[in-house]
Amino acid sequence: MAAIRKKLVIVGDGACGKTCLLIVFSKDQFPEVYVPTVFENYVADIEVDGKQVELALWDTAGQEDYDRLRPLSYPDTDVILMCFSIDSPDSLENIPEKWTPEVKHFCPNVPIILVGNKKDLRNDEHTRRELAKMKQEPVKPEEGRDMANRIGAFGYMECSAKTKDGVREVFEMATRAALQARRGKKKSGCLIL
C-alpha cells in the first residue's frame, strides 16, 4: 500500500530552531553552525497509529526580508509547525503578533502545532543570565500552553533538537493533526489570494 503523503510547513522567527528541528528529525544529526534558511525541503517517513505517512517538510526563513517570499510555501499545506524558542520570550510574542495572522490568512483551517524549541536552554545558567540582563526569563511550559489555547492550536509541544528530547513526538502530533484534518473536508489546505 502506498504511503499517505502530507505536507508540513514550519514557520517562526529567524534563529528559533526550525531548521535544526527538521534536520534532527529527518537526518538524525544536529547542525552545529547556524545558516539562515532561504527555502529547503526534506522528506521523512513516519508511522503513526499503524499508518505509513510520507511527510514533506517545508522549511521557511523567519527573517522579515522573506515575508513576501514565504507565502509561496503555503499552498496545499496539511499541517503547520509554528515555532518559538524557549530562550527567547520575544519569539513567543511574535506568535500572536506575526505568525498566527499570516498562517490563518494563507492557511485557513489548517491545524497548527505550537512548538517550543530549545527546551534544553530553559535551565541553562548562561541563557538565564543573558535574559535577566533584559529583565526576561525563559518561557515557562504554561506560557506555551496558554499561547496554544489563545491561537486555537491543535496542540502544544516542547522539544530540544540538540538532545533530541521530544523531537519525534512533535512530528507524531503533527502527522495525527494532518490525518484528522482531511476527514470531512474535500480539499482545504492553503490558498494564495
Curated annotation (Swiss-Prot):
- Please give the Pfam families that the UniProt record associates with this protein: Ras
Record entry for activity regulation? Regulated by guanine nucleotide exchange factors (GEFs) which promote the exchange of bound GDP for free GTP, GTPase activating proteins (GAPs) which increase the GTP hydrolysis activity and GDP dissociation inhibitors which inhibit the dissociation of the nucleotide from the GTPase. Activated by GEFs such as ARHGEF2, ARHGEF3, ARHGEF28 and BCR. Inhibited by GAPs such as ARHGAP30. Inhibited by GDP dissociation inhibitors such as ARHGDIA.
Q: Which domain of life is it from?
A: Eukaryota
Record: residues binding GTP: 12-19, 30-37, 59-63, 117-120, 160-162
| Gene Ontology molecular function terms on file | G protein activity; GDP binding; GTP binding; GTPase activity; myosin binding; protein domain specific binding; protein kinase binding; Rho GDP-dissociation inhibitor binding
Which NCBIfam families does the entry link to? small_GTP
Q: What is this protein called?
A: Transforming protein RhoA
What species is this protein from?
Rattus norvegicus (Rat)
Species lineage: Eukaryota, Metazoa, Chordata, Craniata, Vertebrata
